């Protein structure tokens, strides 16, 4: 298949990279054969208050689960992101911020960021926040979001960031689960030219009678929009900062002390509070950021993720700032007010490294490459992809149109639960194949198993598991350790089950085939939905596709495809048949979609993730009880899809 084409590491990149192929092999081998020795050395990349002597105490036995790293050391995450850079790099720019409107821009040095974080840490203390308390952060993409996170870390409070697109109900469920005393928010946020009513959403969330722990709501004045005010509870950010001291001694925290909670959707629909601790997470976030992106001092690094997702935590805040990087933060969306915005920002800020998501790349593809006619892009050196498997066609478009065919692409696979990147190319070490996450990072031991838990060797396909721990791994589900054990360690004994399927090719490269629940069983044969979607999107008239299974009288499951066509393309029965034949040719007769529904839009969260549970229910004609659609960017998409569904029984 065309997706097997190999993009070789250029000699120039290999010669100047942190790691070439030989060094990768040596380091990886050491990390697996002697993990204690490997991490003993690489744990020193961050600053410790009390140096560790004990490295690793881990077991994936579901009756005796243990995940501990650097566990007799102490440190502070905020000090690692700020204080340790001040002696030599106080004047280096830490954050470049560009607002939704490009006319709004700020630059904040490490010295200034340190002062802001210390002041806000003292402000939090003045509002009763103490070590171990959980603080909910519901903020727009502004520097103050990072300030709030780092201030919590500085005083030993645990932050729980909630994505700014979530509904009041979603906020309430997270506040209730975490028993937050303090919420940090903003009057409004700006996104795509629209004001987002953040404070109003918090007010509505706090009307829930089960929210009983919140004492204070700290409000940043972002737009000056009108907000309701509750005297005694609500307090302005700027008022607190006016009187706060610029000195705040960082708390000495155990390596295994909680750093943050981040809620992710669970299969039951109840959010899971993923808990990450301090020492191992900081080592892993900073190391993966440096090695995966081949980061060099002074470069401008842009991660387009929202701070409300794990990518924003690990690769916009903690990893880059621990490494003394200059981070670009953008308040809006990179295709507003036009698809040219992404390229304009890369050129304007001389971005060296871009880390973005396939959903944005596909959206830009659909608009057409003419929007990049004026794009220079000469500053770009490395490009990354995150969030879902990137289909080969989008990979190539990204490589050609954004990367001008000279930037290596690191297609990274990881999860909220893993804390950092697990499977990825390294720019100077790994020949890449469009659509493949390639090889494991240091210390990561992936394996494929069948449904009975038997390890599959060589070229194969199965359930993706991890055989041993790594420092960035989550430690528990907050308040529900049993759920943690059940979700990740019961399915395959002695292994961490990722929930993803994957195949390993003849070169040992890993290809993520999608969530195991996104596998369709057609006449007894397993088909990854990502594979069928990739085939559809490789057709020049298809902008985006989502594929699910639906009940089929003969085959058990049939293949139902939702297809968004490129702008201006006519939806015809002839094209529908052409696409069916196209997939048949690309993958085989087994993968031919039974039903193709035209879709002007797909149900996505505001981070761009397609909510397939809605698509599965619509395809199965189960349209009366779809569940909560409040997290969708555009809930109206659901009604449109229901009205034009193809599998009606009435």
Swiss-Prot record:
HAMAP family: Ac_CoA_synth (MF_01123)
Binding positions (CoA): 191-194, 311, 335, 523, 584
One Gene Ontology cellular component annotation held by this UniProt entry: cytosol
Keywords: Acetylation, ATP-binding, Ligase, Magnesium, Metal-binding, Nucleotide-binding
Chain positions recorded as Mg(2+) binding sites: 537, 539, 542
EC code: 6.2.1.1
Gene3D superfamilies xref list: 3.30.300.30, N-terminal domain of ligase-like
InterPro entries listed in its UniProt record: Ac_CoA_lig (IPR011904), ACAS_N (IPR032387), AMP-bd_C (IPR025110), AMP-bd_C_sf (IPR045851), AMP-binding_CS (IPR020845), AMP-dep_synth/lig_dom (IPR000873), ANL_N_sf (IPR042099)
First-tier enzyme category under EC: ligase
GO molecular function: acetate-CoA ligase activity; AMP binding; ATP binding; metal ion binding
Family label: Belongs to the ATP-dependent AMP-binding enzyme family.
Catalyzed reactions per annotation: acetate + ATP + CoA = acetyl-CoA + AMP + diphosphate
Role: Catalyzes the conversion of acetate into acetyl-CoA (AcCoA), an essential intermediate at the junction of anabolic and catabolic pathways. AcsA undergoes a two-step reaction. In the first half reaction, AcsA combines acetate with ATP to form acetyl-adenylate (AcAMP) intermediate. In the second half reaction, it can then transfer the acetyl group from AcAMP to the sulfhydryl group of CoA, forming the product AcCoA.
Residue numbers of N6-acetyllysine PTMs: 609
One Pfam short name: ACAS_N
Amino-acid positions noted as binding ATP in the UniProt annotation, renumbered to this chain: 387-389, 411-416, 500, 515, 526
The protein, known as: Acetyl-coenzyme A synthetase
Organism superkingdom: Bacteria
SUPFAM superfamilies reported for this sequence: Acetyl-CoA synthetase-like
């Amino acid at each position: 298949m065309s997706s097997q084409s190999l993009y070789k590491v250029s000699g120039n990149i290999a010669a100047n990279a942190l790691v070439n192929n030989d060094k990768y092999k040596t380091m990886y081998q050491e990390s697996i054969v002697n993990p204690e020795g490997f991490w003993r050395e690489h744990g020193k990349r961050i600053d410790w208050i009390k140096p560790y002597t004990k490295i690793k105490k881990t077991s994936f036995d579901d009756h005796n689960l243990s995940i501990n790293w650097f566990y007799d050391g102490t440190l502070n995450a905020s000090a690692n992101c700020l204080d340790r850079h001040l002696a030599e790099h106080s004047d280096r720019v830490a954050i470049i911020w560009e607002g939704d409107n490009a006319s709004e821009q700020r630059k904040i040095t490490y010295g200034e960021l340190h002062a802001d974080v210390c002041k806000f840490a003292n402000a939090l203390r003045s509002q009763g926040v103490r070590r171990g308390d959980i603080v909910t952060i519901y903020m727009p993409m502004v520097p103050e979001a990072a300030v709030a996170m780092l201030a919590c870390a500085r005083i030993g409070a645990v932050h729980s960031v909630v994505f700014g697109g979530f509904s009041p109900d979603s906020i309430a469920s997270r506040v209730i689960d975490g028993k937050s005393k303090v919420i940090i928010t903003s009057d409004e946020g700006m996104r795509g030219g629209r004001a987002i009513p953040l404070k109003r959403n918090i007010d509505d969330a706090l009307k829930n009678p089960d929210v009983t722990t919140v004492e204070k709501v700290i409000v940043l004045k972002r737009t000056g929009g009108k907000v309701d005010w509750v005297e005694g509870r609500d307090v302005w950010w700027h008022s607190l900062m006016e009187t706060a001291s610029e000195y705040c001694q960082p708390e000495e925290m155990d390596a295994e002390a909680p750093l943050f909670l981040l809620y992710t959707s669970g299969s039951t629909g109840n959010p899971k509070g993923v808990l990450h601790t301090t020492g191992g997470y900081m080592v892993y976030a900073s190391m993966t950021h440096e090695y995966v992106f081949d980061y060099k001092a002074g470069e401008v690094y842009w991660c387009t993720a929202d701070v409300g997702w794990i990518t924003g935590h690990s690769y916009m805040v903690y990893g880059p700032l621990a490494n003394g990087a200059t981070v670009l933060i953008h308040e809006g969306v990179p295709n507003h007010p036009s698809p040219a915005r992404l390229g304009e920002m890369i050129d304007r800020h001389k971005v060296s490294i871009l880390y973005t998501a396939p959903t944005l790349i596909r959206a830009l593809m659909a608009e057409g490459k003419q929007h990049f006619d004026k794009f220079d892009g000469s500053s770009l050196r490395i490009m990354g992809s995150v969030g879902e498997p990137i289909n080969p066609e989008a990979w190539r478009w990204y490589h050609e149109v954004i990367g001008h065919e000279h930037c290596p692409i690191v297609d990274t696979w990881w999860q909220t639960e893993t804390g950092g990147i697990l499977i990825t190319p390294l720019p100077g070490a790994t020949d890449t194949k469009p659509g493949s996450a390639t090889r494991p990072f240091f210390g990561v031991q992936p394996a494929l198993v069948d449904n009975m838990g038997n390890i599959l060797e060589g070229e194969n396909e199965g359930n993706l598991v991890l055989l041993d721990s790594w420092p960035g791994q989550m430690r528990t589900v907050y308040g529900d350790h049993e759920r943690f054990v059940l979700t990740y360690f019961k399915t395959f004994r002695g292994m961490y089950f990722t929930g993803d399927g994957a195949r390993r090719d003849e070169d040992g490269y890993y290809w993520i085939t999608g969530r195991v629940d996104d596998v369709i069983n057609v006449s007894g044969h397993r088909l990854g939905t990502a594979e069928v979607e990739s085939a559809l999107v490789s057709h020049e008239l298809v902008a985006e596709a989502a594929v699910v299974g639906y009940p089929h009288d003969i085959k058990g499951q049939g293949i139902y495809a939702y297809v968004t066509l490129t702008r201006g393309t006519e939806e015809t029965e002839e094209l529908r048949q052409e696409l069916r034949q196209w997939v048949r040719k690309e993958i085989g007769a087994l993968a031919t979609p039974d039903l193709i529904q035209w879709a002007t839009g797909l149900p996505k969260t505001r981070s761009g993730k397609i909510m397939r549970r809605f698509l599965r229910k619509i395809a199965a004609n189960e349209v009366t009880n779809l569940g909560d659609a409040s997290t969708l960017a555009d809930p109206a998409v659901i009604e449109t899809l229901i009205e034009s569904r193809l599998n009606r029984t009435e």
